[in-house]
Amino acid sequence: MQNTTEKSSRSAEGLYKFFIYFVLVLLAVTIIVPVAWVFMASIKQNAEFYGNPWALPAGFYWQNSVNAWNGAKMGEYMLNSVIVTALALALLLVVALPAAYCLSRFHFKGRKILNTLFMAGLFINVNYIVVPIFLMLRDSDVWLKGHFGSGFLLNNLVVLAVVYAATALPFTIYLLSGYFATLPHDFEEAAYIDGASYFSTMTRIIFPMAKPSIITIILFNFLSFWNEYIISMTLMSSTKAPRTLPVGLLNLMQAQQSAAQYGTMYAGLVLVMLPTLILYICVQRQLTQGMTVGGLKG
């Protein structure tokens, strides 16, 4: 009787594992196949799109990438995205890391109020406040023009980076402070005894210990900033304003669809995807470690 029960439990466990693996493989296929198709489409000649869409490319037609990079200004758009993303990440880390450290490691008056305010920010969808942000910047720009002759708050990559960093603060501080709170206080106390300052303790002890979570935050926010479209399109509305990659890609797709230049369109899409894929491959191990350690400590 016991052997029968063990066999049935093993059979159920094996069936469960098979189901899990089947679902995972199915999800992987649904992700890999479209990405692979886009990469293949980016090196096809235009005539190949009118045949079998699943056929392998007849050759490597790199002119699509050249046309997208030079003719469609994707190189210029990529540089703008690199500047905005790097600046937004730098501003975000400069503000969020000390803020999360103070909120998680020190007890002071108003700490709970600040935590509540940052928590409330998690429930605000950024897409819903794009118009108020635009109106606020526009009115401030009008005031600057009236008093100083010119404004700089709209169609400005630096201002766009500041807005990106500000909208990402609640999530970043919430996640980092939760991780910082799980770190032991023994190292800090030993550092204080040795005469280390609060800043030195934060930068030399706490931040290295929290490296996995910091890398996770950087990757998540990089993906968010790199692929962001609504805010960029709204705040960079002038025809002469610099464009980021998502906005430039949409313009490219509309232009190439009307001209039936599908190869150039997919080549532009590949240029947008490549940096995120390369970054993920480079930090995959640290990202997994950060998520695992955070889950275990939580």
For each feature predicted by the language model, list its residue ranges.
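A hydrophobic, multi-pass inner-membrane permease signature
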Residues: Q2-G298
